[in-house]
Amino acid sequence: MAAPMNDVQRLEKSLLGHMGRAIADHRLIEDGDRIMVGVSGGKDSYTMLHLLRELQRRAPVKFELLAVNLDQGHPGFPADKLEAYFQREGYPYKLLKEDTYSIVLEKTPPGKTQCSVCSRMRRGILYTAAVELGCTKIALGHHRDDLIHTLLLNLFFAGSIKAMPPLLRSDDGRNVVIRPLCYAPEKDIAKFAELMAFPIIPCDLCGTQENLQRKRMQRLMEELGKEIPNVRQSVLNAMANVRPSHLLDKTLNPDPLHASEEGATTTEPKDTQGSASPWLESRQ
């Protein structure tokens, strides 16, 4: 009889299930991939790196991992803490350093969040580094709640129905971004990171600004969750259950007179928590 699982093992199994299904559903990882794993020092990226290595040991295909951290010149950024962690855990790694901190502060108006400018600059640096390092994919640690909050932000403030795709090719075609945690709940990631005692590095630029629109979306979902327990999973399911003929975008529905009534009523949402994929089975 197998020994009972402890909290870490239970969370790891659940998170591996979410990650394995996301990879299988969206073909995020292929045989021979060399994956740059963006590790910021936050709970999400640490968890992603840990889970990817666990999957690497049992995956139906072979792939490489390269942990990469970008030091953007934040005052007091403890790059040595990350390097010590990578060395202790035996991860192949590369540390990048680009002083974008001063540029971000210069280009951001007073009272505004630096997140958008910071993320654009960081993305450009990572894209270039991925090509130089021979990486075929860039893995980012966005989770289920990030996708939901992004969808709501675009809906409420940008007038568009757009979230974060699990897999995205860059405009120039040189890079492919994957989000293996896209099905994983943030609360499970946070608890797992706490139990694993990852050496978390807080973000001084964006993590402490309370009046961000994203924080408002987070609070909104928390309030809705009190009345609708499964609301987060329902919103995630909606992203995989789109009916273009029932929206107003004429590019998606050029012939409305012949639009199908299929999907006009509520249907059973796609289950992102279904049976285990081959990614969750041991490799022979």
Swiss-Prot record:
[4Fe-4S] cluster binds at residues 115, 118, 206. It catalyses: cytidine(32) in tRNA + S-sulfanyl-L-cysteinyl-[cysteine desulfurase] + AH2 + ATP = 2-thiocytidine(32) in tRNA + L-cysteinyl-[cysteine desulfurase] + A + AMP + diphosphate + H(+). CDD domains: TtcA-like (cd24138). It comes from the Bacteria. Its EC number is 2.8.1.-. A motif (PP-loop motif) lies at residues 40-45. Keywords: 4Fe-4S, ATP-binding, Cytoplasm, Iron, Iron-sulfur, Magnesium, Metal-binding, Nucleotide-binding, RNA-binding, Transferase, tRNA processing, tRNA-binding. Its cofactor is Mg(2+); [4Fe-4S] cluster. Residues 247-284 are annotated as: Disordered. One of its GO terms (molecular function) is 4 iron, 4 sulfur cluster binding. GO terms for cellular component: cytoplasm. Residues 263-276 have a biased composition (Polar residues). It is found in: Cytoplasm. Pathway: tRNA modification. Binds 1 [4Fe-4S] cluster per subunit. The cluster is chelated by three Cys residues, the fourth Fe has a free coordination site that may bind a sulfur atom transferred from the persulfide of IscS. Catalyzes the ATP-dependent 2-thiolation of cytidine in position 32 of tRNA, to form 2-thiocytidine (s(2)C32). The sulfur atoms are provided by the cysteine/cysteine desulfurase (IscS) system. Belongs to the TtcA family. HAMAP family: TtcA. This is tRNA-cytidine(32) 2-sulfurtransferase. It comes from Myxococcus xanthus (strain DK1622). The gene is ttcA.
